[in-house]
Amino acid sequence: MFAPLLKKLFGSKNERDVKRMAKAVQAINALEPQMVALSDEQLKAKTAEFQQRYAKGETLDQLLPEAFAVVREAGKRVMGMRHFDVQLIGGMTLHDGKIAEMRTGEGKTLVGTLPVYLNALSGKGVHVVTVNDYLARRDANWMRPLYEFLGLSVGVVTPFQPPEDKRAAYAADITYGTNNEFGFDYLRDNMAFSLDDKFQRELNFAVVDEVDSILIDEARTPLIISGQAEDSSELYIKINKLIPRLNRQVEEVEGKPTEEGHYSIDEKTRQVELNEQGHQFIEDLLSQNGLLGEGESLYSAHNLSLLTHVYAALRAHTLFHRNVEYIVQGDQILLIDEHTGRTMPGRRLSEGLHQAIEAKEGLPIQAESQTLASTTFQNYFRLYNKLAGMTGTADTEAFEFRQIYGLDVVVIPTHRPIARKDFNDLVYLTQEEKYAAIITDIKQCQALGRPILVGTASIESSEYVSKLLQEAGIEHKVLNAKYHEKEAEIIAQAGAPGSVTIATNMAGRGTDILLGGNWEVEVAALENPTEEQIAQIKAEWQKRHQQVIEAGGLHVIASERHESRRIDNQLRGRAGRQGDPGSSRFYLSLEDNLMRIFASDRVKNFMKALGMQSGEAIEHRMVTNAIEKAQRKVEGRNFDIRKQLLEFDDVANEQRKVIYHMRNTLLSAEDVGETIKEFREETLSATINQHIPPQSLPEQWDIEGLEAALYSDFAVRLPIQQWLDEDDKLYEETLRSKILEQIVAAYYEKEELAGAEALRAFEKQMLLRVLDDLWKDHLSTMDHLRHGIHLRGYAQKNPKQEYKRESFTLFQELLDSIKRDTIRVLSHVQVRREDPAEEEARLRREAEELAKRMQFQHAEAPSMEQAVAGEEEELPEGPAPVVPLEPVRNEQKIGRNEPCPCGSGKKYKHCHGQLD
């Protein structure tokens, strides 16, 4: 009740934040005359001065006014661009570790130079994260002259970069790259066999461009580095031939399924399920084709792999459509990013789904993959000491940014007022009527000389609109995943008078549409242009620019609403940049996916009750509210999926941190002899305890089994029964000591043969190899556990608690296996002299060969049904409270006698610190 009154008196939190920063802007402006008076050399010298002052104890906050004033002056001199006051506010927001929402055309790239320069003064490095390689290279090349003028180095990380170039890029003061490349390099670093092979330094400060795209849209899909597993391409081909014989279960008028058909599709959760009739039918088909034994069930334990293949093929045929979720290019399936409309080369679906799509399209089937390392963007970016982001649309997701990442959103005022007109949605009964209205609108705008941007949700839609325009004789350009190489050229002229551009999801394109076209692109197309030519091109552009402004600016037409309001807002934001005129209009129909799947029947019945005729549209607040409600419903569902993914990955993340810390400790250690000694004693103790239980009677001892186990684990044959027969004083403890002496003596014989230095190097490399192999298998086990854990809900158990409990048990077994397998390998190894450097070089060559075969994937996100199954009764009404997870600061070293952070109640040295 008091909230509106308090807001009126004190302003909103956003207004107070902006007001507070406006005072700092005044201080920066006051320094401007002083900076203008400096020579270039004096301005450059400021960087060294700031670095010295920082080293002596001044904070970055204290340096901020002067540093920002220096960057502003350098921008004027080097690039002819002066930071506006609102851009200074944006820079301060980023430095504070918050998200700056800035409208399209407000100069986000230039804003980033302020906090990037300031934080680079610490010498710890700054990462600037973009959504694609083109933008990473473009922004780095654009801003490089400014940074280098001020004495800072700039690097760019790209896929397939030579290791020495990538290492140099990470060593630079400022490093540009994509979220994928930064994430995969983090995983690669934790697979390295030498400290010299690692790329990244401490993760200090990251500025994420299009932060909503990276931290929200991409958060549902984990980053995975995988290697090849067994080949089962023939099975995919055989099962693929059977799937078309299955029929979808149809719905009656009331919406209830009939008995006819073999499977049902839930379009909301994108899941497909075989019904009872379908199970029987597919089992019969498999039996007839010799893939399933006579009378066997598809659900028998030994047939689960076959069941996985069946469901992968069924999903490939029913949920994945050519030119919507993927395109075929050559003999490859290229996935399409649902949020940006771009293809994702090298990205593959997991769990056999990609192979099933290849079989469906008749392409060569690539080998299946096994996870070698994985993480999520959520957990990767929380490793940075400080995280900030920029985007044109973050306010609709402010709740999620705060809940998941602990990041506040600050809406930065625009430099000029927004002059764009956003017209009401027009809703038609059918898609045919909707598209006819779109063509009419295009013709009217083109007659006025206005440029038009038509936004579609898929390649299929964009090509359909293109076909209609061709039939109407309207010249146009198409920008989608098939023609992305022409992107820069198409966008450059999308603002020319009367031009028509069709584009799939424009989110994350990162290029402004300039009214009248882009004169710089025209100049760049000329070889050695003269001053006269440049002046003529600029003059012609100025005429076109003015012509478009007078006609009303860019008109954005959207052919349907997206699942996210944010992507709709991004599309709208393409018009009306920097105070330019413009307009936007959404055309919808009841046959659109969003309306069909999520909008209520009440809306459909309401429209039909109005007696709408063919070609008529409706503009009504109730319809608009229903659409927004449907979008909020989808956004809420997707938020729940991302939250569930994070909660499950947090369990794996704690284990990941322990394993990666263990790896780094091993890589840094010159001698792992003490670690091997501890492993040997613990493994021996466990082996003896199995056959001679502590404080047991001699009659309970299994001496024969112990002798066999010692040979299996330690490669020594010991006559233990003979020792006991010959020595009556040989009790349990003295026997343990004697066995250990014999095992150690046998191992030292190998050391004498190989040499201490060579054996120490071999121990280190072998321990790393065993750790990596077992971690890889552990990841696979954890995947299987996660995919099936939702079924525990049917047994009235909490799936998340069960997952935590079982994953902890699995992790304890992993640590025991690392010790046991390392000792077993070292004990059985046949000694031959090999130079340690040669051994390391050989391992590095093997790692490089592995890297060539690696695949970098985004696995499919878990379905909503899996994520929340079995937990409905436990969830309170309203949004579940989430503890804010802030970006991880520098982690303090855990004392060996302190409680383990995993929550087991044990001391760290007896739990996850056993291998430190």
UniProtKB/Swiss-Prot annotation:
Q: Which GO terms describe its molecular function?
A: ATP binding; metal ion binding; protein-exporting ATPase activity
Q: Name one Pfam family in it.
A: P-loop_SecA
| PROSITE patterns per the UniProt record, alphabetical | SECA (PS01312), SECA_MOTOR_DEAD (PS51196)
Q: How is the cofactor bound?
A: May bind 1 zinc ion per subunit.
Q: Mind listing the UniProt keywords for this protein, alphabetically?
A: ATP-binding, Cell inner membrane, Cell membrane, Cytoplasm, Membrane, Metal-binding, Nucleotide-binding, Protein transport, Translocase, Translocation, Transport, Zinc
Q: Where is this region: Disordered?
A: 857-916
Location relative to the cell: Cell inner membrane; Cytoplasm
Q: List, as start-end ranges, the regions of compositional bias called Basic residues.
A: 906-916
Q: EC number(s) of the enzyme? A: 7.4.2.8
Q: Which domain of life is it from?
A: Bacteria
Looking at the UniProt entry, the stretches that span the membrane are: none
A single GO BP: protein import
Top-rank EC class of the record's enzyme:
translocase
What is its biological role? Answer: Part of the Sec protein translocase complex. Interacts with the SecYEG preprotein conducting channel. Has a central role in coupling the hydrolysis of ATP to the transfer of proteins into and across the cell membrane, serving both as a receptor for the preprotein-SecB complex and as an ATP-driven molecular motor driving the stepwise translocation of polypeptide chains across the membrane.
Q: How does it assemble?
A: Monomer and homodimer. Part of the essential Sec protein translocation apparatus which comprises SecA, SecYEG and auxiliary proteins SecDF-YajC and YidC.
Q: Which family does it belong to?
A: Belongs to the SecA family.
The name this protein carries in UniProt is: Protein translocase subunit SecA
The gene name on file is secA
